[in-house]
């Protein structure tokens, strides 16, 4: 006998009961153990930062990471689901700096020391928020928290060391001087994709955009006009660049002669001038100019060029004068300087201050020097014009300090060498939505610079390189290899312990220390497929058993971040895609369309809504929304709440009706019973059920939850508003046709069981509650995915039922237009059809008569008819 069901269901209370049942009976563990070890479906979870608090974004990412493992488990696959924590990097360091009252990187070493600072970082990341488990439980996600890996674990860090070694040996890693984004507060390079992840990492400002006069060395009163947005960088200008293909002019204005690109004459002051010469840019190449500041002249080595005009295709006439200043603090600038043999001078220290040896400006923060440089050059008659330019500047993703481009002698992944392979392997990946594949992701790969993977910080995996002054390097790929080379037992790979490990140079015999940098934490994230399993050191599984993983999912910001670094490392190590299928979610914005922020007060508290409406409603809301098609949405409590009114209560009411009358009629399912009903409603709903099985299966396999939710909603609506509505008189004490009653209960029971299975990945709590009462089985999540039964599919019957429902809908509309209430019976209705063959059988006519409360149906044929009347 079924347990009684209340029509007034409290979904959050029900979910608490289900959670307790799952934990007590270890249903999650059984769902894994019940599947064969030799049939695996793998997914890789991007670990959140260990001390961060859950929010709608993390919940959004977590939900599909539960949906698809549930689906593939029911399909018969063993799905490993282990949680992970991201521990290293600036998020922890910045928090510890604040807790210790430190205001700069320099104070870390001077005031507290690296050892204490690292100890504080370890303590900080050990404080795992208990909130995480509450949230993950209450959105219905199954995951192994007990065996969670951490990126700070020795085993994880050893695999990262191995990954570095593999890439280094394949000549994909090099050390060199290149320009990258730099944070003067954190005193470290910042990855360009870290900034690109979030629009809040950019700030709109109005900045300097000045035109400077550089006197040509051998031409009297002749200046070349150069444009720049960085006055602080004018302190060191060892070269100017022009475009050889552009046409330049020499003009005479106010007794001085100026050279600039002809298309930029509008940049001249509003003073009369005349053009006295016109020539191609090639004529300017090699000419010398007088520098504005000469303090670094003694640093210029023999063979190096300085104060010379060079050519560059990167110079355009779109902005400025067609002439740009060249210094080491620009990617194209530095590349041109290396190519032309220009002297490289760096005048900022690691905190963004001008070095003390620089006259007039030494010790100033670089931005503070802007105004003083402009004033000095203006006083000396070298500032032609000063303008303002509104533009967007990047900010540090952790401390929000304004970034600048700076030359870094650092460790890089040679993306240019890898790029053809990266583009090729992307073709093998299934992206959903598909437009990201050759759209945003491919474009990010095509435009990617070499990746700076070293950081001038402390809390992270070490750059595993011991570099001798003679140039020899030792790059271990394992702890064992390092122990053998050093003779020291390794218990911790963190600073400062790792910095005390010495090895002997095989070339010259000197004692060698490790280079001081740590690795970008993104290389740890990109190594997750291997490092979470401590591959290749614990060979419990073959590589092909887990790599590339079948599935990953994150929001659009990870296209240029986690997806990208996974792709780079997968291609570099194995010339393989790093994942087979990727689901890209959109972003959940606040109610006002801005990023969700406590300061804005523009979003409802997720915990409060989970307690109020439950986890299934949140899952339905998000899984059925455009956010699962990579589009951004505004958070809406109303849309969240509407899921209860929609699918959930609709299904519950059908279930409640079935249980109520089954108890009244003392009906119980019979083992092995087959449904051979002749009732057209039973045949129709079972035929439609097979279409639902087919469509949901295909949509799950294509990672399209929006279609799954839509198909479930449509079917449950048909079940409630047509099948149950038209079948109410088939059950209960007044229904005397026992055969028909048995058919109804058997059909309804079969349909509800199947719906529970199909919806289990979407609404795991509701499906579990219903399924456990319908069956004697332990859990719907331990059952097998339903197979489509083509024998009961009847497309002609479905077409006739659709026609029937359309007629009914039209009839209701006519009643409404004419203000005729349904309870008022009508003698007859007239239905005009185009062909006699469209006339429905008596069974369908009976449905129309009962639904529209009419006694007789009259059919009329009109071959010129466009639609049924």
Labelled PLM ranges:
Residues 57-69, 76, 85-86, 151, ...:
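Structured ligand/cofactor/substrate-binding pocket environments in proteins
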Residues 378-399, 499-517:
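Short acidic, Pro/Gly- and aromatic-enriched capping/linker segments at domain boundaries
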Residues 211, 443-523, 527-529, 535, ...:
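Feature 926 captures the class I aminoacyl-tRNA synthetase adenylation module centered on the KMSKS loop
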């Amino acid at each position: 006998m079924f347990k009684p069901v209340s029509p007034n269901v409290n979904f959050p209370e029900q979910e608490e009961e289900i959670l307790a049942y799952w934990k007590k009976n270890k249903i999650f563990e059984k769902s894994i153990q019940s599947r064969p070890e030799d049939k695996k479906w793998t997914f890789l979870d991007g670990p959140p930062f260990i001390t961060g608090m859950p929010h709608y974004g993390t919940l959004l990412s977590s939900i599909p990471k539960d949906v698809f493992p549930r689906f593939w488990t029911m399909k018969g696959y063993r799905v490993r689901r282990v949680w992970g924590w991201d521990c290293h990097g600036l998020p922890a360091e910045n928090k510890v700096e604040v807790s210790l009252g430190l205001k700069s990187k320099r104070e870390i070493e001077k005031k507290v020391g690296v050892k204490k600072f690292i100890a504080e970082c370890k303590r900080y990341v050990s404080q795992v928020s208990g909130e995480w488990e509450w949230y993950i439980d209450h959105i219905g996600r199954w995951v192994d928290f007990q065996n969670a890996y951490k990126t700070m674990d020795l085993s994880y860090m050893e695999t990262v060391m191995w990954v570095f070694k593999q890439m280094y040996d394949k000549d994909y890693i090099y050390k060199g001087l290149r320009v990258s984004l730099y944070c003067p507060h954190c005193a470290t390079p910042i990855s360009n994709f870290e900034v690109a992840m979030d629009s809040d990492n950019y700030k709109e400002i109005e900045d300097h955009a000045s035109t400077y006069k550089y006197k040509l060395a051998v031409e009297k009163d002749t200046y070349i006009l150069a444009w720049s947005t960085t006055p602080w960088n004018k302190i060191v200008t060892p070269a100017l660049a022009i475009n050889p293909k552009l046409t330049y002019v020499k003009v005479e204005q106010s007794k001085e002669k100026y050279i600039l690109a002809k298309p930029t004459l509008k940049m001249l002051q509003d003073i009369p001038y005349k053009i006295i010469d016109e020539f191609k840019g090639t004529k300017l190449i090699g000419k010398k100019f007088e520098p504005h500041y000469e303090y670094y002249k003694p640093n210029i080595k023999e063979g190096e060029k300085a104060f010379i005009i060079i050519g560059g295709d990167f110079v355009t006439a779109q902005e400025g004068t067609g002439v740009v200043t060249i210094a080491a603090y620009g990617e194209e600038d530095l590349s041109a300087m290396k190519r032309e043999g220009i002297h490289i001078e760096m005048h900022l220290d690691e905190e963004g201050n001008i070095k003390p040896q620089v006259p007039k400006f030494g010790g100033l923060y670089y931005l503070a020097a802007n105004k003083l440089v402009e004033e000095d050059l203006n006083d000396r008659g070298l500032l032609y014009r000063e303008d303002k330019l509104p533009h967007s500047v990047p900010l540090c993703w952790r401390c929000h300090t304004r970034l600048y481009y700076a030359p870094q002698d650092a460790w890089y992944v040679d993306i240019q060498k890898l790029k053809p392979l990266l583009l090729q392997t992307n073709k093998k990946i299934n992206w959903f939505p598909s437009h990201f594949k050759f759209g945003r992701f491919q474009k990010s790969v095509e435009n990617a610079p070499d990746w700076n993977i070293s950081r001038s910080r402390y809390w992270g995996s070490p750059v595993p390189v011991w570099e001798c002054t003679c140039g020899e390097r030792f790059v271990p790929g394992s702890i064992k290899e390092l122990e053998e080379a050093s003779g020291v037992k390794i218990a911790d790979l963190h600073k400062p312990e790792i910095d005390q490990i010495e090895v002997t140079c095989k070339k010259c015999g000197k004692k060698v220390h490790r280079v001081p940098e740590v690795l970008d934490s993104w290389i740890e994230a990109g190594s997750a497929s291997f490092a979470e399993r401590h591959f290749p050191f614990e060979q419990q599984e073959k590589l092909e058993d887990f790599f590339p993983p079948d599935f990953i999912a994150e929001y659009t910001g990870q296209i240029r971040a986690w997806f990208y670094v996974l792709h780079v490392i997968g291609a570099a190590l194995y010339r393989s895609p790093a994942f087979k299928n990727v689901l890209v979610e959109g972003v959940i914005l606040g109610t006002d369309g801005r990023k969700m922020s406590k300061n804005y007060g523009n979003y409802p508290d997720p915990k409060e809504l989970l307690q109020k409406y439950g986890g299934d409603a949140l899952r339905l809301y998000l899984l059925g929304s455009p956010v699962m098609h990579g589009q951004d949405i505004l958070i809406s409590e109303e849309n969240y709440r509407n899921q209860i009114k929609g699918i959930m209560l609709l299904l519950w009411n059908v279930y409640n009706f079935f249980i109520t009358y089954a108890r009244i009629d003392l009906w119980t399912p019979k083992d092995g019973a087959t449904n051979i009903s002749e009732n057209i409603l039973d045949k129709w709903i079972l035929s439609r059920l097979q279409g639902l099985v087919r469509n949901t299966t295909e949509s799950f396999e294509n990672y399209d939850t929006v279609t799954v939710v839509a198909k479930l909603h449509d079917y449950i609506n048909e079940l409630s508003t047509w099948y149950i509505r038209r079948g109410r008189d088939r059950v209960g004490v007044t229904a005397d046709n026992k055969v028909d009653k048995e058919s109804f209960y058997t059909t309804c029971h079969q349909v509800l069981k199947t719906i529970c299975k199909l919806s289990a990945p979407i609404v795991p709590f509701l499906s579990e509650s219903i399924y456990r009462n319908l069956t004697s089985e332990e859990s719907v999540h331990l059952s097998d995915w339903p197979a489509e039964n083509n024998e009961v599919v009847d497309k002609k019957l479905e077409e006739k039922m659709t026609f029937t429902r359309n007629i009914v809908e039209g009839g209701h509309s006519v009643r409404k237009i004419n203000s005729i209430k349904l309870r008022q019976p009508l003698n007859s209705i007239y239905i005009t059809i185009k062909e006699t063959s469209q006339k429905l059988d008596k069974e369908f006519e009976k449905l129309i008569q009962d639904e529209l409360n009419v006694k007789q149906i009259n059919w009329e044929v009109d071959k010129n008819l466009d639609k049924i009347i």
